[in-house]
């Protein structure tokens, strides 16, 4: 049946500068071409006011809110002994505070209407660890914990909250230098070829499924939608197999 969507992208360059509506608007146009309805937003989730602005826009444009998905992110990779407070804080503000700034105002609506779906974005970097990403890993593991708590708080109101740990090429991940990729290469072993997962299109169905009635029993979980690689570290981690995906029981 489709959905009415607020597409939010602050439109910044990788260095954090700029506020271009182009990235959000291009997605809006793609949705419109497929017969859907969408509007663009360039609010910054790094501020509580920006997060509320996104939620308010959904209510103003479409009259209700049923789902929030919070994939906003930036990278400021640096070894801990070289990392500045600004590099630390920028990543925490966008990822962790950014998740809170959207979920908090949405939760009030969901609690009142006794329904809603929340899908946040964690990462292997937080759950397992990548060198050079103490800021990113802390934020992403924080999102996993945040999501589990929100799930407990809102579950009794008919609301589910789950986190995805994805693996996909985006504007952000394309900025990772080859030297860094090589340094991390030993952390993973290749998955079976038929399980390769590389593009956002491969992750999107997991997000969509979590927002359906058939996933109403899934709450407070962290789901690995990251099948380009499987992690050695997961071998001893209790988890539930879900059609090739893994729900981490942490």
Task: Specify the residue positions occupied by each region the protein language model found.
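Active-site-adjacent segment of SDR/Rossmann-fold oxidoreductases
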Residues: 108-112, 128, 144, 149-159, ...
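The beta1-alpha1 cofactor-binding region of Rossmann-like NAD(H)/NADP(H)-dependent oxidoreductases
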Residues: 42-53, 85
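Substrate-binding pocket helix/loop in short-chain dehydrogenase/reductase
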Residues: 31, 79-80, 87-89
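Active-site helix of classical SDR
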Residues: 103, 139
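Residue(s) in the substrate-gating loop at a strand-loop-helix junction
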Residues: 123
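Conserved small/polar residues in nucleotide/adenosyl-binding loops
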Residues: 229-236
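A glycine-rich helix->loop->beta "capping" turn
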Residues: 34-37, 57-70, 76, 115, ...
């Amino acid at each position: 049946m489709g959905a009415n969507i607020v597409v939010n992208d602050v439109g910044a360059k990788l260095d954090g500068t700029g506020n271009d509506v182009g990235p959000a608007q291009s997605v809006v146009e793609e949705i419109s071409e497929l017969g859907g309805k969408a509007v663009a937003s360039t609010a910054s989730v790094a501020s509580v006011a920006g997060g509320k602005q996104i939620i308010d826009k959904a209510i103003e444009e479409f009259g209700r809110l049923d789902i929030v998905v919070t994939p906003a992110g930036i990278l400021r990779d640096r070894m801990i002994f070289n990392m500045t407070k600004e590099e630390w804080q920028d990543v925490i503000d966008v990822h962790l505070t950014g998740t809170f700034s959207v979920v908090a105002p949405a939760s009030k609506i969901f609690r009142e209407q006794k329904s809603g779906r929340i899908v946040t974005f964690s990462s292997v970097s937080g759950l397992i660890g990548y060198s050079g990403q103490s800021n990113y890993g802390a934020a992403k593991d924080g999102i996993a914990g945040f999501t589990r708590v929100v799930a407990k708080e809102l579950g009794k109101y008919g609301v589910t909250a789950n986190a995805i740990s994805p693996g996909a090429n985006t504007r952000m991940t394309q900025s990772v230098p080859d030297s860094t990729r090589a340094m991390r290469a030993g952390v993973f072993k290749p998955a079976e070829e038929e399980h390769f997962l590389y593009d956002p299109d491969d992750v999107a169905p997991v997000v969509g499924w979590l927002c359906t009635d058939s996933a109403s029993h899934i709450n407070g979980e962290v789901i690995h939608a990251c099948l380009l690689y499987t992690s050695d570290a997961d071998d001893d981690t209790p988890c539930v197999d879900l059609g090739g995906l893994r729900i981490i029981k942490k």
